[in-house]
Amino acid sequence: MDIITLNLVRYKYSADTTLGKLYLNDNILCYTLEDAVRPYGIKIKGQTAIFENPNGYNIGIKHSNRFKRDMLCLYTEEDKVTIKQGGVSFSYVYFHGGNTHINTEGCPLVASNVDEDNFRIYNTYEAPLFKLVKKYMEDGYIVKVKITNLPYVDKN
């Protein structure tokens, strides 16, 4: 099976929030907002971005009881809802809408617009991303997301 890889590139960090851009090939699809990036193997439940993973996480479609709809779920394990990385695990990591780190609980938020100064995103991109990934899956592709942390740059 052929593989389609989305690339999530994290580029701006604060104490509680991480901004990124999600690409397909070299084209930006949307902006992302996640909880704080922590050292590999360190997790604070609901306040930690999933770890950088150059090999990529699998993306599947899973029904969310919380959100009451099918959503894109990231995973590494056979149960298709669990990520095991760095000696810790994350479960039910969905791409979804939201505006700030308060909305993430460890999930990547996706949106069309970003306010970098205030670490906010807006105009959710959840539905277009779901539609795109679902179409690739229906066409027989395996879809993954590779996550890269760019170095922190202090502009002060």
Q: In which residue ranges do the predicted regions lie?
A:
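Cell wall/extracellular polymer interaction/catalysis modules
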Residues: M1-V143, N149-N156
